[in-house]
Amino acid sequence: MRTSLFVVAVAGSLLIAPAAAQAVPCAVTDVMIKASTAWVTKGTDLKANNWSNANFHTGNIAQVRTTGISNHKTWPWVQANKYLLPLDPANPYAPDPQASGEAYLAVSFFHPEPAVLQPLRDNLRAQAKTGKFDYWKSPDALTMSLPSFTEVAVRDLDQELLDYSYKSYRSLKHRTFNEVTGLWSPNVQTNGWAVQGLAKAILMLPKDNPYRADYAKTLRKSAHTLRYLQRHDGFWGATGKDSAATAMITYAFAAGINAGVLDKDTYLPYVQKGWQALQTALDADGLLGWTAARNSWKPASAGDSAGFAVGSFLLAGQQLVPLTPGC
C-alpha cells in the first residue's frame, strides 16, 4: 500500500496543546511542572545522550508547550550533543539512537535552525536507502524510531521516508504482533512502548492518510486488550505496578481519544484511572517512582525512577489537558 502526503501536518503536531506562551492553570499542568522540575533536580545521568534522556526531553518540551513554563534544560542538552545521534558505528541504524532525534524535532519548535535536524535527516535517509526493513527488532522501536521517521517525512514531504518507515512497521508487526490477542509482547511495558509510538505517529499524520488508518487499527486492537490488563489500583505493569508502562498506555489511550481513533466513552475512564495512579507514584517533591527497568520482569519499588518514564508521564499529562474540565 502506498500513500501520498497531500496535507502537511503542522510541525510538532503530536503536541495537542495551548499556545506555547500561554500558561494553563489546572491540576494536570501543575503536577507536570512539579514532575519535570523534580527530575531535572534529582534525576541521575542527566547529561548522557541516550534513549532514556531523549524520551524525557521529548516529554519536557511537551510540558513547556502545554504550560508555557520552562526549566531551560532541553536546549542545553541538545547543544551539548551537537545535534548528533549517539550512533554505534557497528550498527548505525539501530532504533535507540534515533530517539534523540525525536527530542531534537521537539526542540526545533523553538529552535528551527536547519543544523539541529541535519544529522537526524542524514541518518534516516541513509537507512531508507539500504532497502532493508528489519532493523527494528523489538516493539520498542515504535517509540524509538517511528516518530522521528514520521515527523521528518511529514515536514519534508518525503514520501520515500514515509513509505520506508511504514514497511519497517509492517515487518516488525509480522514478526512480533499477535493478531489474536492484540499484544506485541507478554511484557506489558513492551506493549506500552508500542502503543505510545503508534499514537505519536497517528497524531503526526494527516487524517486521510492510509498509513495513519493502519496504525489506528493496530492501536485499537492493542487498546482493547490492554484496558483489561489495568490493575485495580490503576497501574499497568509486567510484575506489579510500573509507572513507565502506566504512563505510556495512559498517553496512548488519551492521544487516541484526542485523535478520534479511540472511543472517548470507552477509554476515558481508563485514562483517568491511570493518571490518578501515576499521582500516587510521585514522592513529596514530585519525583516519579515505581519505574520498572526497560522491558524488565523485575518488580519496581518506590525509589525506582528513570527519565524515560518521566517523559511519558509528561506526554500523558499533555494529552489529559484537553480531556480535563477547567484546563
Language model feature labels by segment:
Residues 1-23:
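Secretory targeting and sorting signals
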Residues 8-9, 17-18, 145, 291, ...:
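Low-complexity, intrinsically disordered/propeptide-like segments
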Residues 24-123, 137, 238-327:
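CBM-like carbohydrate-recognition segments
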Residues 44, 108, 133, 150-154, ...:
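Short amphipathic alpha-helical segments at helix-loop
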Residues 83-186:
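Extended ligand-binding groove/face enriched in aromatic
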Residues 139-143, 150-250, 262-293, 304, ...:
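Extended ligand-binding clefts on enzyme/binding-domain cores
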